[in-house]
Design a protein with these regions (language model features):
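Catalytic phosphate/metal-binding cores of nucleic-acid and nucleotide-processing enzymes, i.e., regions
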Residues: 1-126
């Protein structure tokens, strides 16, 4: 992992990990799941980026232009990421689109369980 220096300290630079999952219609449940996924990815040594958590704070998805802007921003986050992390046990069209975009951008796509296994942390509790 690359290292950076900050005021005389050497620190590890965490790779950016874009978090995607099949989200339900329940906003509260999605927020809870997304936060748990992000924590697991963070604990594995990555800097998680989860549009669902970020955008819900300031965008109104029911406003068409804000919905479109959210999609555009999410694609920009993915372009800047080092890895796409697919979380959860099911895949929907949005996740398939994220995987296809990552492939086009030559960004590694993996699962949360894959990251945790590689990092030696075993499987995460679901």
């Amino acid at each position: 992992m690359p290292r950076i220096r900050e005021k005389g300290k050497e620190m590890k630079k965490r790779p950016l990990a874009y978090i995607t999952a099949h989200w339900s219609d329940n906003e509260y449940e999605n927020t809870e799941r997304a936060a748990k996924f992000c924590r697991a990815v963070y604990d594995a040594g990555f800097s998680p980026i989860c549009p669902l958590l970020i955008h819900s704070l300031f965008l109104r998805d029911e406003v068409p232009q804000e919905h479109k802007d959210g999609l555009d921003m999410a694609r920009d986050y993915l372009r800047r990421s080092n890895v796409l992390v697919v979380c959860g046990s099911s895949v929907d069209e949005a996740v398939k689109n994220d995987i296809a975009m990552a492939e086009r951008l030559r960004i590694t796509a993996t699962t949360l369980d894959g990251i945790l296994t590689v990092k030696g942390q075993g499987r995460r509790d679901k």
